């Protein structure tokens, strides 16, 4: 593994300040009446790693910038540790921020880049040296302090940007898509390093990304946004297994959840070509919600569709594309006129044109309202 801080012993840990945040009915409306963030409500506990995730234009970065003080809050209240921050300037909010672009000074050494903000605050040189050396040790940058950014790799430059934030010893760390400029392999490494950094600093972090994999692998809780509105807040496992609506179900998870439109008919979910028996617990919830004989959307994840040797009770499927990813196949298949993605182990070989048998694990299925797209529970 490239140099990093994953192996630094616990003796280098340094607990920073506490910070609890409360966002109450936050709104952002621009002069042209574009409503970017709508009634955003969230309580963030001290030491949480919160990830805002959603597609471009969902309001996640705007919300982060309002927390930082870089965007004015149109309505609502931002409270940090019991103090309203709406009118507090950015420099006085005790917040450190890491941006997508590293924004390093090319003519300065790594040490001077990390120390620059502290020098502007007129921190004592001895304190600056202590903080920079501490951060450099954590981030695996001790051997690079005299180099300039042009002599560093992309991952090393991102670490310098992280180090510049760490030395401020702020109560809250904000990160706005910090890994977007890195290649795929380096993103995986840096994900692990940032998670480890959170454990070492033991402080509050808020991270923005459009990448659901980053959200799932790093967050204590995920905040999923669409069109400026929070869709769901929860732990990664919760939002994956219990999505609040079809948007969350389709956004979280790769490949996305499969959806089939149909109706509830007695004990079955039915379409023109499919008839699937619903487990008792799920059926009880569907009936209690009043969906008997009504249109619904059936959802099932690719890994919950089983490929089996034909036994007569399997559902016939025809493979249109077979993608081998190494340990598994992603099979794009047609099932009764419905296009589905199936995750299958690479024990067997698959190819386009194959006729296969599948079964749905109905204990893992989801149902959604056909109009509102809200989960039926």
Short names for language-model regions:
Residues 74-77, 127, 227, 365:
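Conserved coupling/switch loops of ABC nucleotide-binding domains, chiefly the family-specific signature
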Residues 68:
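Helix-to-loop junction immediately C-terminal to a conserved catalytic motif
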Residues 76-84:
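Conserved ABC transporter NBD signature motif
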Residues 90-247:
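ABC ATPase nucleotide-binding domains
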Residues 53-55:
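The feature captures the beta-strand-to-loop junction immediately N-terminal to the Walker
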Residues 244-296, 306-318, 333-350:
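ATPase nucleotide-binding modules
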